[in-house]
Amino acid sequence: MTEQISLVDVSSSVSLKGEDSSNVALLRDLFINDVAASDPAESSADVHKDEHSSDNSDNDNEAVPKPNDFSQRRRIQNAQFEALLSKRTDADSNEAIDRAPIALSDDELSIAHLVEKQDLGNGMLDPREYQIELFERAKTQNTIAVLDTGSGKTLIAVLLLRHTILNELDNRANGKPHRVSFFLVDSVTLAYQQAAVLRNNIDQNVAHFFGAMGTDLWDKRTWDEHLQRNMVIVCTAEILNQCLLNSYVKMDQINLLIFDEAHHAKKDHPYARIIRDSYFKAQPSQRPRVFGMTASPIDTKGDITEAATRLETLLDSRIATTSKITLLREVVSRPIEKVWAYNRLESPFATELYKLMDTRYGNIKVLEGVYRFAWHASSELGKWCSDRAWWHALADDVLPKLEGNISKLVESNTLNAEHGAVFKDIIRIREASETVKNYSFADPELPGELSPKVQLLRMELSKHFSDTTGTKCIVFTQKRYTAKILNELFTVLNIPHLRPGVLIGVRPGDIGGMNVTFRQQFLALVKFRTGEINCLFATSVAEEGLDIPDCNLVVRFDLYRTLIQYVQSRGRARHCTSTYAIMVEKDNAEHEGRLKEIREAEKIMQRFCETLPEDRILHGNDHDLDSLLQEEEGRRTFTVKSTGAKLTYHSAIAILARYASSLQYEKETVPQVTYVVGHVSNAYVCEVILPEKSPIRGLTGSPAIRKAVAKQSAAFDTCLLLRKHRLLDDYFNSIYHRRLPAMRNAKLAITCKRTNEYDMLLKPSIWAKQRTTPIDKLYGIHISLLPSKPLSRDHRPILLLTREKLPEFPAFSIYLDEDVETKVLSYPLKHGLQISVDELQSLTTFTLRIFRDIFHKVYEHEVQKMPYWLAPAKALDGPGSGTNPRDWTDWDTVSFVHNNDEIPFTRDLNPDSLVNRFIFDNWDGRFRYFTVAVADTLQPSDPPPPSVPRRRHMNNIMNYTLSLSKNSRARFFSGCDWNQPVLQAELVRLRRNLLDKMTTQEKEMQTECFICAEPLRISAIPTSIVSTCLAFPAIISRLDSYLIALEACDELELVIRPDFALEAFTKDSDNTEEHRGQQIHFQRGMGKNYERLEFLGDCFLKMATSIALYTQNPDDDEFDYHVNRMCLICNKNLFNTAIKKQIYRYIRSRGFSRHIWYPDGLTLLHGKDHSKKLLSEGKHALGEKTIADVCEALIGASLLSGGPENRFDMATKAVTALVDSPSHRVSCWKEYITLYTMPKYQTEKPRGSEDDLARHVEEELGYHFTYPRLLASAITHPSLPSTWGYRVPCYQRLEFLGDSLLDMVCVEDLFRRFPDRDPQWLTEHKMAMVSNKFLGALSVKLGFHRRIMAFSNPLQAQITHYVEEIESAQAESRGAVDYWVVAKDPPKCLPDMVEAYLGAIFVDSKFDFQVIEVFFERQIKPFFEDMSIYDTFANKHPTTFLHNKLTNEYGCTNYCLKAGELPTIDGAPAGVLAAVIVHGNVISEARSSSSRYAKVKASEKALAVLDGLLPFEFCQKYHCGCKETQNSSSAVEIGTAI
C-alpha cells in the first residue's frame, strides 16, 4: 500500500500540470516499488584452471559484481514503515472518533466535519456577491460605492475599466471617436500606487500624471498625444480640472470617471470643481459614466444623511452600500478595539539642548519649525525625543537645503540682498549642526526621558512582540517628525522581535530632515509586506488608499479627528484576531468627547445605510433565501440509492463549498465557489465557477424567476455534474484525493522488479534466412580500423560478404593494444559480386581457417550453411558506395590460404622467415602468438627468461612452448630439433570484449614470451589480417546488435538510424533507470544505454498525445485531457503494447558474450560447444518499467532520425505504434491538422478589443495572429464568468497543450547542448526552465500580468504584490538573468498564461512547431545560456537536499523516505504520514493532507535532526558503515517532490 500511496499528491494533481509545476520529481524512478536483487551471475572460470583444456580460450575472465542484500533491505524498510503507520493509525482513531459529530441528520452526516471545521455556512463567495452586483450596477448607472476599507472597491473599479475599455475598442472598430478613462486620486502617492495596480491588471496603456511632472506646461498637442496613446490615465484631480477648463480635454472624450476616496468631493476640492464646472456643463449624452469609491460619504463633522445626499447630487450618482454589517464582517474582519489610557502629560518645557539652541541660534528663521516641534515634543514625547529632533533637523544631508532656504528668505525680505548676512546665517547654521553633533544625548532608558504616552506605547509593544508569533503593527501619528523620532527611539530601545520602520508622506523640497522619496516609501511598504519591517510608524499616508498589507495591530498614537480617519485607519487591521488600539489621555475631556462623537457618527452612518431605498442596497443574492427555503414543493431532488444520501437545492450550496475546500493547497486560503447571476429576458440565470484547480470548471444553470432559485438550481446541476465525473462520492463528499491521483499515478502503476523472464534474440534473423538463399551473388561491407594513435602492428581492412545487402552501419569504437580507441568504419559496397563455385569454396576455406587458427574452432566445410564470409580487402580511398567487391578483394591472399593449410616448419627454414608470423598451439586455445624477432642469444634448451608468464613446465624453452600431455611430450622431444631458433613473441591476450577498455586484471597480464616454432603451427594468414580478425568478435557482436535493433524497427514499420535504434534497446545494468544510483550488474562495452533517449521520447510522447487529444476532443475540459493522456502515456499502456508486439525480444540487456558471437548453424568438429550457452542466454529478466522505458526511448530515437517531410514524422508514427490507441492514429505530423476542426469561437469575427490585443502582442512578441480570439482565450482566467468573456473559453485547454510544447522545446535544447549529461541532470535543469517560478517572472517581463481577464479580488492582490517583488528583484540583480530564483512563487495564473500563449500560437499557425522554437530562442533561452547558474535550483528542494546530504556528505545508502495514507473514519479529512528511516531508525515523521507536503515536512525535520552532525558522528549514531561497502551495489529509495 505504502509504495503506491507515496506517489499520490492531491495538490499537484489538481494543478494544470504536475508541477511539474515548482515542485518536481527529481529522482522520479527511485520510488517505484522495490528493485529485486539480481541473481548472481554465473561465475567465470579461472583462465588457468586446466592447462590441458582444449578450449580455455572461451573462458571469460571479466569481473561480475557480487550479489547484494538490496531487496532484503527494502523489505525490512517496508515492514518498519508499515508498523509505524499502523501505530499512528491506532493512536489517531480514538481521537478522531471523539471528535466525530453524533447528532446530525442523515443528509448532513457526510459533510458535518468539514462544515464545522471550515465554518462554511452557506459558502462564502470569491468574488463576493455584493461585488458582482455592484459591478453590474456600475455598468448601467453612476454609482458611489460606500464600502468598508478592505472590501474590494478597487477590484470593482478594475472590472469596470475593463468593461469600459472593451466597449471602447469595439466602438473604435466601428469608427466612433476615441475616448479614454480617467482614474482620479487625491495624492501623488496614490497616483503611483493605483497606476501600478491598473497596469498589472489591464492590458492597455495606463499613464499616471501628477503636478511635479510639469503638466501645467503641456499644450493641447501634448494632451492629444496622451489621449491617443493611452486608454486609462491616472492623475491627481487638479490636472484633469485644468485640462477641462483649458479645453485640452473635453468631457465627451472621457468614457469613465473614477473618483478614488470620493468623500473629498466638497466645496472647492478639484473633485467638486470637475463635476460642477465641466461635467454638468456637458450635454447628458456626452457625459461619461461616474464611479466613486469611499468608506464614508463624509470626512468632517456634521449631518451624515445630509452629507451623503449632497455627495450624491454633486457626483450625479447614487450611493450603493450594504444594509447588514454582518455581510461585510464575513469579508472584512472587524478588529477588537481597545483604549490605551496614559497618565496626564506635563506642559511643554525647554530641555537643556533646547535652551542652548535657543540662546545661540534662536533668531534663525529657517529653524522656527524645529523649535515648535521640539517644544511640543518635550510634553508629547519626552526629553530624549525632543532633543533628537535637532539631530535630524541639522544632519549633514539637510544642511545644504537649509542654507539654500536662508538665501531665499533673505532675498524675499530685502530688496538688495546682503550677501554678508546670508553668509553669516549659513555659518551659524553650520555651527548649530556641530553643537548638536557634540551634544551628549541621554540614555532613553533613564527615568524622565520619555513621556507617559511613549512609555505606555513601549510597554504595550513589548507585550505584543514578546514572542515570534508574527505580529505586524502600524502606529499612526499626526506629524511626520513624530513618526520619524519614534522609529529612531524604538530602534535604540531594541525590543526583541520588533523591527521598526517609518512611512511618511512625500513633500518635495521639505527640510528639517523629514524629506523622503517615493522610492523610499515604496521600499518601506515592500519590507513591511515581507516582514523585514514589522512595526511601521506612519502618518496619514498609510490611512487612505495606500496598499498596506494586512496587519494584526493598529495603534492610533495621535487620536483621529474625523470619522473617515477612524474608519480608514481601523481598516488596516484586517487580520481575524486584530487589535485596534486608541491612545487617549486620562481625564482628558476632549479625548473622551472625540471618542464618543466618532462612535455616534458611525452608528448614524449605519442607520443611514439601512434606511436607503431598497434598490440602492446591496443584499447579495441570498437576501431572500430563508423565505425561499419554505417553498420546496416542485423542486428537484436527487437520491443516491445505495446510501440514501439526498441532494436538494438547499444542500447543493454547502456541498459545493466543501468540494471547493477539498482542493486547497497547504498554506493557501480556502478555494471558493463563484456564483454570477445575470438577467436574461424576464428571468435570472446563474453561472457557477468552481476554483481553478477543479477539473470541472462549472456550468450555467437554468433560468429562474428569482435570483436565489437560479443560484440554487445551478449549484444543484453542478453537483450532478461532479457526480457524473465521480468527483463526489455516494455521500456527496469530495473524493478528489482518491480520483485524480489514481489516474495521475497510472504512469507509475507498474513495477520495476525483475519478476518476469522474457525471450531474447541472440542473433538477427537475417543469418538464419540467408542459409536457405541460393548463393549466386554476394554483397560486401568494407570494414577498416581507424586508430586514434598508431597501433603496434598493421591492421588491414577486411570484407564481410553476405547473401543479402546489409544496411550502412555507424562508426563505433573498440579498444586495441593498450586501450587505444579505434573507430570501426564500415562501408557497404554498392554492387553485388557474382561468385563462382571455386571462388565460394576459397572464401569458405579462408573464413573457416580464421575460426580455426585464431579462435580455436574447427567447423565442417559446409558452404550452404555459411551465414557470411570473411575476405582480406584492399584499402579504400573513400566511401565505397560505388565499388565492386571483386575489385577490392585480395584474391591472392585468399588463394594462398586456400591452398596452404599452414606454413610447414622445416629444419632448413630461414629463421628470419619466422618473424612477423601468427603462430598458434593446435592443442590449447589459450596460446596464440605474434612473432617479433629471433632471439639469437637463446637456445631451446635454455630456461625461459624470468619475465615470461608462468607455466607448469619452466625447465627449458622447448618444454615451456609444448602443451602436450606426458606421453606425447616424450615422443615429441625424442624427435624435435633442439638447434632450431628461439623466437621472441607476443602472447595474444584472451580478451575478446574489445568494445570496452581493459580491466585491471587484463592490463597486468604479461605478454612477452620466448618460444620454439616446431611444437606450434604457423598460420598461412597474414598477421595484418589476423590483427583485424582478432577484433572480429567485438565487431560482429555490435553488428548483430544493430541488425536486431533494426529488425525491431522493421516490425514497427519505423525507419530509425541504426545507432539510435540500438541505443534505444540497450539496457546495460539491472537498474539502468536509476540514473545516479550505483549500477547493479553493469554490462561493459554496450555503448550508450536508453536513458537519454527515454527522457527525450517521454517528452515527445507527452506532446504528441496532447496534440492528438486537443485536436480530436475540442469540447473536453482540462480534466478529461489529463486523464485521457495519462491513460495513453502511462507505463502500463506502453508495457502492454510492448508485450503484444514482443518488443522485449529485441532489448539488449547483456554485454559482449564470448559464447554467442560465433556463426550459428555450422557443425562444430573441434573446440568447445556453445549450443547450451545459446539456450541459457536466450532468456533475460526484465522489469515492466524497463520495457515501457524502451518504448519511450524508441520514440526518442525516431525523433532524432527525422522524417521524410517533417522532422517529427517518424516520432509521430512511433507514438501511434506504441500507444496503440484509437485516440492516436496519426502516421505523420501533418495529419494532426487534418484532425482539427476549429471551434466556433476561434473562427468568429473578433471584437475590436481582441484585434487591439492581438496588435499589441504582435508589436511586443512578433507573432501575428490569424485568429485573435485564440489569444483572447489564452488570457481568460477560469474565474471570469463566461458571459463576460464573450463566449471565449478560459485558457485551461490551451495551457494543457502549451505545457507539453514548452517541455518539448526546452528538452530538445538541453538534449542538443549537453550530449553527455545524464537524464537526471537534464531533468533538474529543465525544471528551472519550465518552473512556475521562472514562467511567472517571464509572464511579467512579457506583460501578460496586465492582460489577464480575471474576476478575483485575491488574485488581483497576489499579482500586484508579485509584480512589485519580481521587478524589485530584477532592479537589484545588476543584470543577472537568474534574478527570479530569489523571488517568491508567482500566482499560478501567470505561468499558465505563458503556456496558454504557446498553445494559442501553435494552433493559430496550423501546428507549426517552429513558432514555439522562435519564441523559445527569443524569450526563454537568453535566461539559460549558462546553465551552470541553475545547478542548485532543483537541489534546494528539501527532499533532494536530504538525499544529497545523506549520500554525498555521509556516504550513506541505507535510508528511505516512505509515505502512506492514514485510514480515517467516515467524513474526516484524509491524512498522509511520511517518515525518514536511516539504518532502521525513524529519524523524522510528518503528517499532511497530501503525500507531497508530508514528504517535504518529513525531509525538513530530518535535515534539522542532522544539522551540525559530522560524518563520524553520523556513523556512530546510526551505526552506518556504508562507506566501507561502497563497492556493493545499492540503490537508495528517497522521496520525490511529488
From Swiss-Prot:
Query: Residue limits of the RNase III domain?
Result: 1044-1203, 1254-1406
Q: What is its EC number?
A: 3.1.26.-, 3.6.4.-
What molecular function does GO assign, one term? ATP binding
Output the Pfam families linked to this UniProt entry.
Answer: Dicer_dimer, DSRM_2, Helicase_C, ResIII, Ribonuclease_3
Q: Where is this region: Disordered?
A: 39-72
Q: What is this protein called?
A: Dicer-like protein 1
For the Dicer dsRNA-binding fold domain, which residue ranges apply? 652-742
The keyword DNA-binding is assigned to this record: no
Q: What family does the entry list? A: Belongs to the helicase family. Dicer subfamily.
Location of the Helicase ATP-binding domain: 134-315
Record function comment: Dicer-like endonuclease involved in cleaving double-stranded RNA in the RNA interference (RNAi) pathway. Produces 21 to 25 bp dsRNAs (siRNAs) which target the selective destruction of homologous RNAs leading to sequence-specific suppression of gene expression, called post-transcriptional gene silencing (PTGS). Part of a broad host defense response against viral infection and transposons.
Q: Where is this site: Important for activity?
A: K1388
Q: Which gene encodes it?
A: dcl1
